[in-house]
Amino acid sequence: WETHKILDENISVNPTAVRVPVLVGHAESIYIETEKEIDIELAKNCLNEFSGISVIDDVQEVDFPTSFEHGHGTDDVYVGRIRKGLSKNNSLNLWVVADNVRKGAALNSIQIAENLVGSKM
């Protein structure tokens, strides 16, 4: 329901929340469907270009973001396990980790204020 309030009522979202015993940090498994087929390397490159997003995705080294390593004490959002969905060529799976205290609350408020000041609202 939050996604509909923030973005658009027509976005199809099927969220599931799971609480696990970690001190800080949120992690999400995200499934996305697009209109066209997705090139995984292009998706990784696009994510890497965004300020505040760090891609950690090395299947050979079994390297991906975790709440323990990446979910606290930093402003970045960490994305890994980027792969095509098994059922559709136009789907994508991601694993996302962030410090919910910093990125989820405090930093987002500051970034919104900076954007408002920058746009002279």
Segments the model singles out, each with a brief description of its role:
Residues 76-121:
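NAD(P)-dependent Rossmann-like dehydrogenase/reductase catalytic/cofactor-binding core
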Residues 1-93:
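C-terminal substrate-binding/catalytic lobe of Rossmann-fold NAD(P)-dependent oxidoreductases
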